[in-house]
Swiss-Prot record:
Name of the protein described by the UniProt record: Probable tape measure protein
Keywords carried by this UniProt record: Coiled coil, Viral release from host cell, Viral tail assembly
Key word Coiled coil present: yes
PANTHER family: FELS-2 PROPHAGE PROTEIN
GO biological process, one term: viral tail assembly
Role noted for this protein: Serves as a base for tail tube protein polymerization and acts as a template for tail length determination.
Coiled coil (residue ranges): 13-52
Family named by the database record: Belongs to the P2likevirus tape measure protein family.
One Pfam family matching this protein: PhageMin_Tail
Entries under InterPro entries matching the protein: Phage_tape_meas
Native species: Clostridium phage phiCD119 (strain Clostridium difficile/United States/Govind/2006) (Bacteriophage phiCD119)
Keyword Coiled coil: yes
Length: 944
């Protein structure tokens, strides 16, 4: 490698090291910036969470306070309204001592049941008492009247006051007793049902007609029927009552057109000579009278309206007569119905959601009223105390005793304000100058703070810069080698080589400058060219470094961003300090001074109230407490002799009474005791004899019953024993026969199936001998080996099943016993004794089990040894036929063949590799069977 290549390699390595170092500086700066940003973001998130919690707390607190305040205001308002209404009602009590607490409870109960405001019921109760409803101690009659009107108001789509005043006006107009309330309500409800009107409309207008109707003896039922007829035809309720009033007035007033027409129409009838009032008293319906007048008008070729002096009365007559007469009759009949139409309508109107919500709302208001009633007296006392205190304070101010103190406080506060203004006046210019200096020197302050920020960043980059220095030093050796090579070659150093020499300290700056100036002067022609080239080279170098070195580019970008961000934060902090912190502090200072007046005022009030309370307590102690003590002591000593005498007399009386009671008790009960003792001893011998006789009889009965039972049960036991032993041999024989038969059947089937299997195997082999002579031995060998493996493998399968069964038993026992972890109960109470118990049971049964197995195997062996006793199967028959056929074939082959090799070719044997047995004929099968039986016995004895 040439010296130039080595130098170039050193420079490249130096550049790579510098890039790596710059990347480390960039990474350190970026990590610091990320950490700063993360900290700022975490702080901002924490502040945001605190702001959310604070806002939520403010909202919740405001909601709670608002709800509580609204509830208190609502309760206070409802309670005050109810109190005012009931107080207003109490002015109607007169001399009657009404149980006001009971009355208030009844009103609240009615409000809760109907959903009508308690204050409205109280106001209506006042109107009811004003209209003449009687006042009693328990107010039972009045509250019954209120309850009925509350129901009518719901059923008639109006308020309770309208329903009540209408009812009261009708009762007063007709001079009815309050007991007629149901009758009036029924008529009003039927009028609403039959006409186009409501109880509310009737309540507002009935007073226009009821006085006239009552004066004319026109019943309220006829008023209702008339208004129902008229409103059903479209006449508004107010006009209908006006028209009906005009009709009644004209018919009843003497000398009117209607009165004369009535007298003319009744001539020659049973109503002749009677006035309208007399006809009404006689119970004649209005429509019948109007029909008579209509007939008279038609005779005179007039209309019914001509029979009246006013158009209003004529309209009413037309609505109640002629074709409308039948409807009037039906309406009049409906007014006297026996059905409780008010309660029915009330029940329907109360079963709506609006009604239920109203009841719930009034229940809450009534709860507030009850709370208010409990608190109103303490609140009254507190208000009176406050009024008294304010009055005393006003007197103190007016009398001059507090005037001087207030003046002194005002003067002191004025002096304090003046002092603050003076201090502020002196300090403000200095603060303004300081602010101006800060504003003027803002860039300098910012640069200082930026320097602090940059210094903190560069602290983490020092190590990277040290690494950069080491990279430059690392290139020194290569440069030296390069220079030696250049010296040996006798060449002149280039500008790049000179730069490398300077950077590695192998060439001084003066030497490099001299060499570069010489080269530049020679090439560019003077210092100006050199300057241009230098600037161009610097710019080109920076551009090349920016374009080719990502570490340098990132470092510059991050450094600039950090400087810009730090400057922004520092300058923002300075601006916030002078635009927010200082004004806020000034506002807080002003607020503190503005609140000082209130604080001094409250402090003075507290001091004054404390002195007033103390003085009142002292005065009360000497004017109330001590006189009360003295009075109580005097009363106590005054009552002492009487109480002592009373106590002695009471004790003496109790003693005498006790003595009399004891004597009376003894006189009464001692003879009874003696009589009972005498009677007891007189009856004792007879009772003993009766008991002995009864006992002896019961013992005899028991003995007889026991003997009889013993005879019966002894006979039954003996019979059962005889029967048992009589049937025992048969049962044993039956069991043995069944058992032996099952064993024999099993052995027979096994022998038969074994022979059949062997014969089928041999038959199959014989059938395939001609085509596969070489595979016969392998087939026989594999079949027998598979059979044997199946027999011996059954032991492992059986063992696995037994293990699974035992494991299932243990798991089920553990779950049923509640054991889910190693337990001392299972270890000490079950585990210790379980193997011993199994062994004891196994040891007690092993001899019988071995004997049973030996018997079974012996029987099976005997049956296998004597196959002639077994019924010959198809397989055996085919096997014998095959053997006979083979023997015959061998005989033919022996006869026809002249060579000895034919016997070897045709007598093909089956060699089964199992104890060296060769199967040729049936005897070989028996031999093979015996060997298999022996192996089975050995396998069973060894425990498969």
């Amino acid at each position: 490698m040439s010296a130039g290549s080595r130098a170039l390699e050193a420079v490249i390595r130096m550049r790579d090291e510098a890039s790596r170092t710059l990347r480390q500086v960039r990474d350190a700066t970026r990590a610091l910036q990320n950490q700063t940003n993360s900290t700022s973001q975490a702080q901002e998130r924490l502040q945001e969470q605190f702001r959310k919690v604070s806002n939520a707390a403010k909202i919740a607190g405001a909601g709670i306070v608002t709800g509580i305040g609204a509830g208190l205001v609502s309760a206070s308002k409802a309670g005050a309204e109810f109190e005012t209404a009931m107080t207003k009602t109490s002015t109607m009590f007169g001399d009657t001592k009404v149980d006001t607490e009971n009355l208030n409870n009844k009103v609240l109960e009615l409000s809760k049941n109907t959903g009508i405001a308690a204050s409205s019921i109280g106001e209506s109760l006042y109107n009811a008492l004003s209209s003449g409803i009687p006042v009693t101690k328990d107010m039972g009659s009045a509250m019954d009247f209120m309850t009925k009107n509350a129901k009518l108001s719901k059923a008639g789509f109006t308020d309770i006051d309208t329903a009540l005043t209408a009812t009261a006006k009708v009762l007063n107009a007709y001079k009815m007793d309050v007991s007629e309330t149901d009758r009036v309500h029924k008529v009003m409800m039927q009028t609403q049902n039959k006409g186009i009107t409501t109880v509310g409309e009737l309540g507002a207008t009935l007073a226009q007609v009821t006085p006239t109707a009552s004066a004319m003896s026109f019943s309220f039922e006829q008023v209702g029927a008339s208004l129902a007829n008229m409103t059903a035809q479209g006449t508004p309720t107010a006009q209908a009552t006006t028209q009906l009033n005009s009709l009644l007035a004209e018919l009843g007033k003497t000398g009117t057109v209607a009165n004369k027409s009535l007298l003319s129409a009744t001539k020659g009838t049973k109503y002749a000579g009677k006035s309208f009032k007399e006809l009404m008293q006689a119970g004649v319906p209005l429509n019948e009278i109007l029909n008579l007048m209509d007939g008279s008008a038609k005779k005179n070729k007039k209309s019914l309206i001509d029979m009246f002096g006013s158009i209003e009365a004529g309209k009413a007559a037309l609505a109640l007569s002629g074709q409308n007469s039948e409807q009037y009759t039906n309406n009049l009949k409906a007014m006297s119905t026996q059905a409780d139409v008010v309660s029915s309508a009330y029940a329907k109107m109360s079963n709506t959601l609006e009604s239920k919500v109203g009841i719930l709302k009034e229940s809450f208001k009534n709860l507030g009223i009850e709370i208010y009633s409990k608190l109103k007296e303490p609140l009254k006392n507190a208000a009176e105390t406050g009024i008294q205190c304010l009055s005393d304070l006003d007197k103190q101010f007016s009398s001059g005793s507090l005037k001087a103190g207030i003046s002194q406080i005002a003067q002191s506060f004025g002096d304090l304000t003046s002092t603050i203004i003076k201090v502020a006046t002196k300090a403000l210019p200095t603060m303004i100058k300081s602010l101006s200096w800060v504003l003027k020197n803002g860039p300098t302050i910012a640069s200082v703070l930026v320097s602090i920020k940059v210094a903190s960043i560069m602290t983490s980059a020092v190590k990277s810069i040290v690494a950069l220095k080491k990279a430059w030093i690392a290139a020194k050796l290569a440069v030296r080698v390069y220079m030696v090579g250049m010296a040996e070659a006798g060449t002149v150093l280039s500008g790049f080589q000179i730069l490398v020499g300077v950077l590695t300290k192998n060439m001084t700056i003066a030497q490099a400058r001299t060499m570069l100036l010489a080269k530049a002067s020679a090439l560019l022609g003077g210092p100006i060219g050199i300057a241009i080239v230098a600037i161009t080279a610097l710019v080109a170098g920076l551009v090349v470094l920016w374009n080719t070195n990502k570490g340098f580019r990132d470092f510059v970008i991050n450094a600039w961003n950090n400087i810009k961000e730090t400057t922004t934060k520092v300058w923002g902090g300075i601006c916030n300090f002078f635009t927010q912190t200082i004004p806020q502090a000034w506002n807080d200072l002003c607020t503190s001074f503005s609140n000082a007046v209130q604080w001094f005022g409250e402090m003075w009030n507290n001091i004054k109230q404390a002195f007033i309370n103390g003085w009142n307590a002292i005065v009360a102690f000497f004017t109330q407490t001590i006189p009360t003590w003295i009075n109580n002591i005097g009363v106590w000593f005054g009552q002492l002799p009487a109480k002592i005498g009373y106590g002695l007399g009471f004790a003496l009386g109790k003693i005498i009474s006790w003595g009399i009671s004891v004597w009376t008790y003894l006189v009464t009960n001692v003879p009874i005791w003696i009589n009972n003792v005498v009677t007891f001893f007189a009856q004792l011998p007879n009772k003993i004899w009766v008991w002995l006789v009864s006992t002896v009889q019961k013992i005899g009965q028991w003995g007889i019953a026991m003997l009889t039972s013993a005879q019966i049960y002894t006979s039954m036991i003996i019979n059962n024993i005889v029967t048992f032993f009589t049937t025992l041999p048969g049962r044993i024989w039956t069991w043995l026969t069944n058992t032996v038969q099952k064993v024999v059947t099993w052995g027979s089937q096994m022998a038969t199936k074994g022979k059949e299997g062997a014969k089928k195997l041999i038959n199959t082999v014989v059938d395939t001998l001609k085509s596969l002579p070489k595979k016969v031995m392998d087939i026989g060998k594999n079949i027998v080996k598979g059979l044997w493996n199946g027999i011996t493998g059954a032991g492992g399968w059986l063992k696995g099943k037994v293990n699974d069964f035992a494991k299932g038993v243990i798991d089920g026992f553990k779950n049923g016993f509640g054991v889910h972890s190693p337990s001392w109960k299972l270890r000490d109470l079950v585990g210790r004794f379980l193997p011993l118990g199994i062994w004891e049971r196994y040891k007690s049964r092993i001899a019988k089990f071995e004997e049973y197995i030996d018997n079974v195997v012996s029987n099976l062996t005997q049956r296998m040894y004597k196959p002639q006793e077994i019924e010959e199967s198809d397989y055996t028959r085919k096997y014998k036929e095959a053997i006979a056929q083979r023997t015959e074939q061998n005989t033919i082959n022996k006869t026809d063949s002249k060579t000895t090799n034919n016997k070897e070719d045709n007598n093909i044997t089956i060699n089964i590799n199992l104890g060296g047995v060769t199967v040729k004929e049936e005897a070989d099968i028996n031999k093979l069977t015996k060997m298999l039986v022996r192996e089975i016995k050995l396998g069973i004895a060894g425990g498969v």
